[in-house]
Amino acid sequence: MSQGQGGITLDELIAQADYLKRYIDSLQRTQLELLESINSIDSAKQAIETMKSGNKEMLVFIDRKGYLLAKVGGIIGDKVTVHLGLSYYAEVDLDSAIKILDKRKDEISKAAQDLNNELQKAASTYNQIVDILNQIQQAAARRQQGE
């Protein structure tokens, strides 16, 4: 079909598929980051519960991937410093920290769900375009065999 008839060219269809593939990859990376944030919040809450139980020692990851642990002793378990967002932190009691972390987890979970919905829409559109491209390729192959 020509552009004047309201259709799109094969090159435009291929470009749209390429764009959607990159968009899907970006959404998947963001989704992974959100899930890692949720896991970090859960770990922080577990640490607070350990502190609330009166345990004065804790194993702490030194790096983000967990290659190195250190035993930390002498923990005073009545206050922690919690990240509020952007570059803001606050020293709060343990129960307040859990409330802040729960709220943050809810926000991130909502964002992850919204992102997942967008990812499903993009994947569906991408799959439709790939199906169309496959049909075009099969039709071209049949025409070539008929010649």
UniProtKB/Swiss-Prot annotation:
Family per similarity comment: Belongs to the prefoldin subunit alpha family.
Pfam families according to UniProt: Prefoldin
Subcellular localization(s) per the UniProt record: Cytoplasm
NCBIfam families noted in UniProt: prefoldin subunit alpha (TIGR00293)
Assembly and oligomerization: Heterohexamer of two alpha and four beta subunits.
Gene Ontology molecular function terms on file: unfolded protein binding
GO cellular component: cytoplasm; prefoldin complex
Superkingdom of this protein's organism: Archaea
InterPro entries to which the protein is assigned, alphabetical: PFD_alpha_archaea, Prefoldin, Prefoldin_subunit_alpha
Gene: pfdA
Principal subcellular localisation of the protein: cytoplasm
Function of the protein: Molecular chaperone capable of stabilizing a range of proteins. Seems to fulfill an ATP-independent, HSP70-like function in archaeal de novo protein folding.
Gene Ontology biological process terms, A to Z: protein folding
Protein name stated in the entry: Prefoldin subunit alpha
The keyword Cytoplasm belongs to this UniProt entry's keyword annotation: yes
Keyword Chaperone on entry: yes
Keywords, alphabetical: Chaperone, Cytoplasm
